[in-house]
Design a protein with these regions (language model features):
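Short, gly/Ser/Thr-rich active-site loops of penicillin-recognizing serine hydrolases
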Residues: 178-188, 278-305
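Beta-lactam-recognizing serine transpeptidase/beta-lactamase-like catalytic domain environment
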Residues: 1, 5-269, 305
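Short, charged, low-complexity patches
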Residues: 149, 273-282
Length: 305
């Protein structure tokens, strides 16, 4: 789901045109010491996405495409400004940042040189090309909460404006006659995104639902959806001590794509692939868009006064 960050940075900070074609060769061999692969490629089954543009790379979640544009964008922007372009975009969109919710929360972390220096020592604390390649597809030290991802999806829907999250709409008197407190939308941050980048994101995220990694469940949904699937690589041992290599699955969407009203984030530990989670969102979307009721009151429990 992080790849929209890389897409924005590539277009607005790296000068890439969304129509720029890259041929996915499966194994990314720019560095001799670290050669990651596209998620559909393996030695046994060396499939690739072929020649694709940015919108198709979002729709099919092509790692290879983002390795290349991510590396080139990082190198040029870092050389010109001394800054990490992806960290700037991710921070503005709320990843690794407080959401504003009225509860204690873990703010997670963004993959960057400073964060790696905190977590590692000696030579291992260095920030290398391999770190960049992992970071631009959302791996490495990136660690975000489901609520941050929902706020991120909302910020994309709002064209770069991120609002603080809140659980509270308003507080009224016991008889609902007096308004005691009402929550107002609070802008947490704003990222200026070009029309070119916004158009590419919109098309790519719509294509994810119609022909891409979520099409199995969302292709025929009656309301246009903009979404992105995610897979967080994980391997370790289960509580019983047995080895398990199932990846974590994540998914974000906003809908309707042309006039957004709702943003959703779903995360399943060891859920394998983010595309599977599109099915989880359908009942939520159905409930939201089929209900015309406006709940102005809260049902009471069986309490005798």
């Amino acid at each position: 789901v992080y790849k929209m960050v890389t897409a924005i940075a590539a277009v607005d900070m790296g000068g890439f045109d969304p129509g720029y074609i890259i041929e996915d060769k499966g194994l990314y061999t720019f560095y001799e010491s670290f050669q990651p692969k596209c998620h559909i490629w393996s030695l046994a089954n060396p499939r690739t996405h072929g020649k694709i543009d940015l919108m198709e790379a979002i729709a099919y979640s092509c790692n290879y495409y983002f390795y290349e544009v991510g590396r080139l964008t990082y190198d040029s922007y870092k050389k010109e400004t001394g800054n990490n372009p992806f960290d700037i975009v991710a921070k503005s969109l709320g990843l690794g940042e407080p959401t504003g919710i009225e509860l204690p929360e873990d703010t997670g972390a963004r993959a960057n040189a400073e964060e790696k220096n905190k977590q590692y020592a000696g030579e291992d604390a260095g920030w290398f090309g391999a770190d960049v390649l992992q970071a631009v597809i959302g791996q490495s030290l990136n660690k975000f909460t489901p609520l941050q991802l929902a706020c991120y999806a909302s910020a994309l829907a709002n064209k770069g404006t991120r609002y603080e999250a809140t659980l509270l709409s308003r507080v009224v008197s016991w008889d609902y006659q007096d308004l005691i407190k009402e929550s107002k939308p609070v802008v947490a941050s704003t990222l200026e995104i070009s029309e070119k980048a916004l158009a590419a994101l919109d098309q790519g995220m719509r294509m994810t639902a119609s022909i891409g990694t979520a099409e199995q469940y969302l292709r025929d949904y009656p309301i246009p959806i903009a979404c992105k699937t995610g897979t967080a690589q994980w391997q370790g041992t289960t509580s019983t001590g047995s080895f398990s290599g199932s990846d974590h699955a994540s998914f974000v969407l906003y809908a309707p794509a042309d006039n957004p009203e709702i943003a959703i984030s779903v995360y399943v530990e060891r859920g394998s692939q983010g595309g599977n989670l599109a099915n989880v969102c359908i009942p939520i979307l159905d409930a939201y868009f089929s209900s015309s009721a406006k709940y102005e009151t809260v049902a009471t429990e069986n309490i005798a006064y």
